[in-house]
Structures are given as structure tokens and as C-alpha cells.
């Protein structure tokens, strides 16, 4: 089952601040999400409380939040930030 991965424009802007090793891991995450929306065996992924569709991935000191729209087979990467600010609203 193939998923379409969409990256929010704010995330694209924030990627410029990512260290090269974390950027490489982020790209690996995107490729993996296309075929496996919750790759727990490969990444540190947890579902966020209060939602069945929102997940977070730990990449070093950064957190990536994404939404899985199961019926539409779409994954939206909606936020990437340091751990300190990851769970606050934008």
C-alpha cells in the first residue's frame, strides 16, 4: 500500500537548520513512510495522545510530527522542531 507524503511549507523552511546527519535521517524517514506509515522497527515513533492520526518521530534532538490520513493514503509532515518546542502550537 503506497502513501503520498506531503511536506508542509513551514517544514521545508525549517529543514535548512537541520544538521546534515539529521537531514539524511529525515530523507530516509520520508522514503520509508511512502510504504510504511508507522515504521516502529526502524524509527522511534509514538502516537500523540488525543489523536489516532498524529505521530511523532525522534531524529536526534529534533521531533517530526506527521498526520496519517488512512482513507486517502496521505501522510502530511506538519512540523519539525527541537525537542524543547516540539509539542507547543506554532
Curated annotation (Swiss-Prot):
Pfam families linked to this entry: ParE_toxin
* UniProt keywords, alphabetically: Toxin-antitoxin system
Instruction: Indicate the segments annotated as coiled coil, or none if absent.
Output: none
The record's annotation in InterPro entries points to:
RelE/ParE_toxin, RelE/ParE_toxin_dom_sf, TA_system_RelE_toxin
Q: Which domain of life is it from?
A: Archaea
Q: Where is the signal peptide?
A: none
Methyltransferase found in the keyword field? no
**Role played:** Toxic component of a type II toxin-antitoxin (TA) system. Its cognate antitoxin is RelB1 (Potential).
Q: Which family does it belong to?
A: Belongs to the RelE toxin family.
Q: Which PANTHER family does this chain map to?
A: PTHR38813, TOXIN RELE1-RELATED
Please state what the protein is called.
Putative toxin RelE1
Its source organism is Methanocaldococcus jannaschii (strain ATCC 43067 / DSM 2661 / JAL-1 / JCM 10045 / NBRC 100440)
Q: What is the lineage of its organism?
A: Archaea, Methanobacteriati, Methanobacteriota, Methanomada group, Methanococci
The gene behind this protein is: relE1
